[in-house]
């Protein structure tokens, strides 16, 4: 399981919370992904992973460096 530092911008945190995803949910999904991919709309790295309560999330992020992730968006998806 990789470890990352997360660089949270307040607007991004508000944006993902509007989708029902907390910081902790996002970080859990990104640090322990089920699959990794890329966003079709932006080409940014993305993953499918689990929220702390078991919901399946799709998370999009950017690498600022090898260890630092900037969240972009996240939302719940169906299997």
Positions of predicted regions on the chain:
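Ribonuclease/tRNase effector modules and their secretory precursors
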Residues: 1-79
